[in-house]
Amino acid sequence: MQLGLDFGRVEALVAGVDEVGRGPLCGAVVTAAVILDPERPILGLNDSKKLSEARREALSEEIREKALAWCIARAEVEEIDRLNILHATMLAMRRAVEGLAVTPRLALIDGNRCPKLAVPCAPVIKGDAQVPAIAAASILAKVARDREMLVLDALYPGYGLARHKGYPTAVHLEALARLGPTPIHRRSFAPVRELLDVVSIPCAPTS
């Protein structure tokens, strides 16, 4: 699809859309949609994974202040388990775009596929490193989800959620095996599902 856009500059009424949290074993998948204001530039936008936590936090506040419109949305653990992670992510992206206070003329989606939207959309592979609005969306989503994981870490101590943010690190997998899944763990993900299968195996009767 020929978009006729200069990815290095802010385009009027173009929404960037990105997600954070497809890979973790627990918690919601969080998405964001952002329409930047060409008259109010934000310096230093980049893929959220390439920025320090302090820089992400500062940019998140600047994006909220300067963007023409922004919306953070989500799909909950129950939706992920019911729909699968791909469809839940598409649902959360749609919610983010539909939640914008300004209707975009085009939505650019990070990745290789688009959700079903009422506005024209196009996927952009590695868009968070190419399109400023997608980079802004990745920052909002990352900061929002990381903050949620700090809250969940306090609610479910022992899993190290504040450190690894729910991703399947060795520390998380060890804690999961030792403590068992919590209500925020995704039952449809193999490491969690396999643990539940082991727990549900009935013991052999003793003679």
Curated annotation (Swiss-Prot):
Reactions catalysed according to its record: Endonucleolytic cleavage to 5'-phosphomonoester
Cofactor note as given: Manganese or magnesium. Binds 1 divalent metal ion per monomer in the absence of substrate. May bind a second metal ion after substrate binding.
Subcellular location: Cytoplasm
Enzyme Commission numbers on file: 3.1.26.4
Binding site for a divalent metal cation: D18, E19, D110
Coarse class of the protein's main subcellular location: cytoplasm
PROSITE patterns hit by this protein: RNASE_H_2
Cofactor: Mn(2+); Mg(2+)
Ranges for domain RNase H type-2: 12-201
GO biological process terms, semicolon-separated: DNA replication, removal of RNA primer; mismatch repair
GO molecular function (one): manganese ion binding
InterPro entries the UniProt entry points to: RNase_HII (IPR022898), RNase_HII/HIII (IPR001352), RNase_HII/HIII_dom (IPR024567), RNaseH-like_sf (IPR012337), RNaseH_sf (IPR036397)
Taxonomy, superkingdom: Bacteria
Family listed: Belongs to the RNase HII family.
Biological role: Endonuclease that specifically degrades the RNA of RNA-DNA hybrids.
Protein name: Ribonuclease HII
Native source species: Azotobacter vinelandii (strain DJ / ATCC BAA-1303)
Lineage: Bacteria, Pseudomonadati, Pseudomonadota, Gammaproteobacteria, Pseudomonadales
